[in-house]
Amino acid sequence: MFMGEYEHQLDAKGRMIIPSKFRYDLNERFIITRGLDKCLFGYTLEEWQQIEEKMKTLPMTKKDARKFMRMFFSGAIEVELDKQGRINIPQNLRKYASLTKECTVIGVSNRIEIWDRETWNDFYDESEESFEDIAEDLIDFDF
């Protein structure tokens, strides 16, 4: 399970260190793709296989299902950690997530998310104010 928040930098070649706490669970190779809220999602290969199976059940007669699958899968790439624990994030994904030099990597249960730091801070500030309201709106959820 992935959890926590870590600040890292993207170098001039598009490489970024993955937090050491995440590297063990991700293994050497994992998948990154376009996520929601203008961030990138990162999944283990095993989790990615489960997502692929779920996606196959989406109705291809629905225009939104086709659009979502195209965006999600066309942005997906298998990445490999180098000896320094870095991955290379392709330009198209850096552009999608508006990644600048300063990035934040967070753990969200079954995935990691890679955010531009300023975008993350804005999202966090906005969400922090409504955290309790969001929790109340989640049906059948209890700690």
UniProtKB/Swiss-Prot annotation:
It comes from the Bacteria. Keywords: Cytoplasm, DNA-binding, Repeat, Transcription, Transcription regulation. One of its GO terms (cellular component) is cytoplasm. One of its GO terms (molecular function) is DNA-binding transcription factor activity. Residues 5-47, 76-119 form the SpoVT-AbrB domain. GO terms for biological process: negative regulation of DNA-templated transcription initiation. It is found in: Cytoplasm, Nucleoid. Its main location: cytoplasm. SUPFAM superfamilies: AbrB/MazE/MraZ-like. Belongs to the MraZ family. Forms oligomers. This is Transcriptional regulator MraZ. It comes from Staphylococcus haemolyticus (strain JCSC1435).
